[in-house]
From Swiss-Prot:
A motif (JAMM motif) lies at residues 173-186. It comes from Listeria monocytogenes serotype 4b (strain CLIP80459). The keyword Nucleotide-binding does not apply. This is UPF0758 protein Lm4b_01560. The keyword Hydrolase applies.
Amino acid sequence: MLIHEISENEKPREKLQNYGIEALSSSELVALIIETGTKNESVLTIANRIIMKFKNVGEMQYASIEEFQLVNGIGIAKASKIMAAIELGRRIGIVTEQEEVVVRCPEDAVKLVMPELAFLFQEHFHCLFLNTKNQVIYRQTIFVGGLNASIVHPREVFRLALRKSAASIMCFHNHPSGDPTPSSEDLLVTKRLAEAGNIVGITLLDHIIIGKNKYISLKEKGYF
């Protein structure tokens, strides 16, 4: 069925205007993002094909632009729009979660970063910056690539911590393999960060390694 064959009230844009965004199905939301179909297929048909490709809508956030382009009817332009919408939603979610979040234990912090780090294909070194009440005041990815002591320099981490007037920091990095077991380099980086924090008066509360749906707290394991 082509889009002009659908009744006006059932078209995604008109449905949104009449009933609100919550009334739209996931396929209809995707249809609004990609905007147009092809000569032979409606935008809703293509959008539904995208939804069916993944086990659930949440899986879309881990797809690459190339994976979206494997769907018949999706080229680079439409795939880019989908990726942009997903990334915008992710960033909004980060800001919302960050507001007045108090970190009382490693699990609190992991809930904040796990969605972002668990399924990345490269190692990312990420920091949370906290105030004296252990509230998250800022977060940032500091390094991307293999974690080693020559790349992760405490100077870069604590320069930002001082700029944000942080009282303490929590560091994270992911293991793309999914296994959060620390390497010797992980432990060396942690030791250097803890020592630098003691010098500048900003405590390293923890260094947590993120795997696929699991993590290891180096503080809890007694590594520093």
